Amino acid sequence: LRVGPIFRAPNKDYLLPRILIGLMGLVMLGATIPAYANPTSNPGLINLVDPALSLGETAGAFLGRQLTVILVALIGAVTGLRHLVMIGGFGMAFMNGHDAILMGLVGGPDFRVAAIAGLVFAVLGLLSIVLVWRAPKA
């Protein structure tokens, strides 16, 4: 029976993609949590009106989806598990990419900054996937 220390050394594999995913997750978490109190504070929900703006309808589904992807990404960033980092990167890329495209198509000048930020997050999410695509050599 081999007994090791309670706290192991941190996993240093995939450090750059983990930092990217973690920072994106924290930024998105900072935009998502306040939106539960006021859904119109989130750029993706600003055009909704009642009843779709309630948390039991469209706004709640949007925020729930966003929070789920953020939590998966943050868990991947903390644990360093390759597949969770890739899933988090895909979630960030897909969610931010499609939001950016939709905001760019129907948004207008008010959404330009949010659309550009969404595209940047999508590219960073895809970059994190590419960086962990291959397993590290043992």
Predicted regions and their residues:
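Cytosolic juxtamembrane helix and N-cap/initiation of the first transmembrane helix
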Residues: 2-28
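Hydrophobic alpha-helical transmembrane segments of polytopic
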Residues: 17-27, 62-65, 88-95, 117-124
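Hydrophobic transmembrane helix segments
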Residues: 27-59, 63
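Core segments of alpha-helical transmembrane spans in multipass integral membrane proteins
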Residues: 30, 54-77, 90-94
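Helix-loop junctions at the membrane-solvent interface of multi-pass transporters
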Residues: 37-38, 76-79, 104-106, 131-135
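Mid-chain, well-packed structural core segment of small domains
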Residues: 75-105
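Membrane-helix boundary connector in multi-pass membrane proteins
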Residues: 87, 98-116, 133-135
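Membrane-water interface at the C-terminal end of transmembrane alpha helices
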Residues: 122-138
